[in-house]
UniProtKB/Swiss-Prot annotation:
GO biological process entries: response to stress
UniProt-recorded Gene Ontology molecular function terms: zinc ion binding
Cofactor: Zn(2+)
Binding site for Zn(2+): H67, H71
Protein name: Protein SprT-like
Active site: E68
Organism lineage string: Bacteria, Bacillati, Bacillota, Bacilli, Bacillales
SMART domains given in the database record: SprT
């Protein structure tokens, strides 16, 4: 799906569910990581996350578009467009738009684990942060530490 197709989709969804035209730009933003989309208040444009389209398909993308169009139309008409506003929640229910989008499966960053071992007493230290082995020593016997394993 390219920029023209997403623009057409947003315009169609706006007319079908809201009965009002979408007069601004809709585009994909590759920098969005965990958000499905966002409505920009100053430009009135809508940015969408392409990864949600890849992962969940067009149905989820239409849900995200409906959510962002709720922000758009309420803001344009001067009503409460924020998540906490009653107007926003009522319009979400009326057009059957999701309040939150699905969670990204690969959104969780894998944790790095560093395993250090004392050269003298063989005590192992498991750390999430890397330590300077020239500066720090074993807390038990003051022996030299050695990095055994680094997982990422």
């Amino acid at each position: 799906m390219d920029e023209q197709e997403i623009q057409r989709l947003v315009e169609e969804v706006s007319l079908q569910y809201f009965g009002m035209p979408f007069l601004h730009k809709a585009m994909f933003n590759s920098r969005l990581r965990t958000t499905g989309g966002r409505y920009l208040l100053n430009t009135h444009n809508i940015e969408l996350n392409y990864r949600y389209y890849e992962m969940y398909g067009k149905e989820e993308l239409v849900g995200i578009v409906k959510h962002e169009l709720c922000h758009y139309h309420l803001h344009i008409t001067g009503r409460g467009y924020k998540h906490r506003d009653k107007d926003f929640r009522e319009l979400l229910k009326a057009v059957d738009a999701p309040r939150f989008c699905k969670r990204m499966v690969n959104a969780e960053k894998e944790k790095r684990v560093y395993v250090y071992e004392c050269m003298e007493c063989l005590l192992q230290y498991v750390r999430r942060r890397q330590i300077n082995t020239k500066r720090y020593v074993c807390g038990k016997c003051k022996g030299k530490l050695n990095l055994i394993k680094k997982t990422s």
